[in-house]
Amino acid sequence: DFYFLNYEQHDPYELLCRYFSELLDMVTWGQFDSLAHLTYPLRYMPKDVEITPFADAIDRVFRALIQKQIALEVNASGFRQEIGESLPGEALLRRYYQLGGRLITMGADAHVPADTGSFIPRTCSMLRRMGFTEYSVYRGRRPCPVPLGEEYEGKEERSLT
């Protein structure tokens, strides 16, 4: 797990190269519905690690997701962490959209009850600004689209009610 690694002993760029290669292998295998934590390693790596050298590898993952009709999870937990943005962030989500990606799910990584649904309203607004019109929930391994309406506008960031 990237959380436990000592980055003085491991080259972050080598780890990311292997990570994105394994993600592509997993998506090619395709026996799951939604890819979560695309940028998970960045939470724990040194802050000066750049993801831009992996643009081609990420594009390959995005294209495979689109071809396999596997959703990309947009996780709101980054808004309540030091990273300060969704995971993946806006630039990668825009690229996914540009490549034709429309199938998304949302999560909040609520490890405590108070975080349930936190920052989902902000995430919905961000996704609408990018052009996304819906997200999916899964029933019986089938995506069920839910409109990204304006129902969250003006809502508290930590509350869906």
Feature-to-residue mapping (PLM):
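Extended substrate/RNA-proximal surfaces in nucleic-acid metabolism proteins
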Residues: D1-K68, E151-T161
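Charged catalytic cores and adjacent phosphate/nucleic-acid-binding surfaces used
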Residues: D48-T161
